[in-house]
UniProtKB/Swiss-Prot annotation:
Protein name from the UniProt record: Ribonuclease Z
Assembly: Homodimer.
GO molecular function: 3'-tRNA processing endoribonuclease activity; zinc ion binding
Positions contributing to Zn(2+) 1 binding: 60, 62, 146, 216
Binding site for Zn(2+) 2: 64-65, 216, 276
InterPro entries for this protein: RibonucZ/Hydroxyglut_hydro, RNase_Z/BN, tRNase_Z_dom
Keyword Metal-binding: yes
Cofactor(s) required for function per UniProt: Zn(2+)
EC number: 3.1.26.11
């Protein structure tokens, strides 16, 4: 699994920070979180394959998070895409995509499936997989608070139990149809009448990785608790402002770096990657002061301020 930060800026891009977008590479697919203007060009400078993007997750409908969608949709059409593309987002996402496709002329002839998440439900599974290789995922949404309807996402790796071949052989089960049934989750009955369940011949799976993505939001304690419940490892949280601009953060319904650190503590995650940095900052020195203080009390926690093209590998 690998995260690639395609854009780490906020409402206004800079020479060094493009509009928000994060790509997650998992099991041969790319999952894109937000798609700000210039995303498709940022992709060119990375190993992210646009044709492997099957799912785009939009946190909210502000321009800096969505204006890269039309160009990306057209470009992958030019490259011959035929398989469906899923786009997820808050209410009115369907209308937004519909209006985007009305502008000008395009040659998009692959299916686009649009899924809207509720901002009333405390949490919901909006996407999942069930691959036979045992490496699956679930994507949850959780409503957050911004100036427009907004949702956060949690990507959860789901690993299936592995077959214990030696244990199966001890029970007299040979490689063949019976073993396949057990692998597929069904019980079998041996010739002696004994029933063998999948649990009898499997090794419990290792816990998969779990990544939280806040989108734009004020700090929400419930979001931190939601992440902790699911065992979040890596938290990607907006930190538009440094701590000296708390009033600006409140007025614009954004977070400061201190807010992000507070949610990190509540989430139990071991890594924070702060992003969505305001264009007013030429460097991150004012952020680092608060990070240093936090690290003095929590030396085991990893804290990064994302830059465009940052790659983070989850091993």
């Amino acid at each position: 699994m690998k995260l690639t930060f395609l854009g780490t800026g906020a409402a206004v891009p800079t020479k060094y920070r493009s509009h928000p977008s994060v790509a997650l590479k998992f099991d041969g697919e790319i999952f894109l979180f937000d798609c700000g203007e210039n995303t498709q060009r940022q992709i060119i400078f990375t190993d992210v394959s646009p044709m492997k993007i099957n799912n785009i997750f939009i946190s909210h409908l502000h321009g800096d998070h969505i204006l890269g969608i039309p160009g990306l949709l057209q470009s992958i059409a030019f490259q011959g895409r035929k398989k469906p593309l899923n786009i997820y987002g808050p209410p009115e996402t369907k209308e937004m995509i519909k209006n985007m496709l009305k502008i000008g002329y395009h040659s998009i002839d692959y299916p686009i499936n649009i899924h809207e998440a509720s901002i009333e439900s405390p949490e919901m599974i909006i996407a999942s997989s069930n691959n036979s290789n045992g490496n699956n995922y679930e994507v949850y949404t959780f409503p957050v608070k911004h100036s427009v309807p907004s949702i956060s996402y949690l990507f959860k790796q789901i690993k299936k139990p592995q077959m214990d071949i030696k244990k199966a052989e001890t029970l007299g089960i040979e490689i063949g149809p019976d073993l396949k049934k057990l692998k597929d989750g069904f019980s079998i009955q041996l010739k002696n009448g004994k029933v063998i369940t999948p649990k009898d011949v499997t090794i419990p799976p290792k816990k998969g990785y779990c990544i939280g993505y806040s989108g734009d939001t004020i700090p929400i304690d419930e979001f931190g608790k939601f992440l902790k419940y699911h065992g979040c490892n890596v938290l990607i949280h907006e930190a538009t402002f440094d701590s000296s601009m708390q009033k600006n953060a409140v007025d614009t319904m954004h977070s400061t770096i201190l807010d992000a650190l507070d949610i990190l503590e509540k989430s139990g995650a071991r890594t924070l990657i702060a992003t969505h940095i305001s264009a007013r900052y030429d460097d991150i020195m004012s952020f680092e002061r608060d990070i240093v203080k936090f690290k003095e009390k929590n030396p085991e926690i990893e804290i990064l301020i994302a830059e465009d093209f940052l790659e983070y590998v989850l091993k």
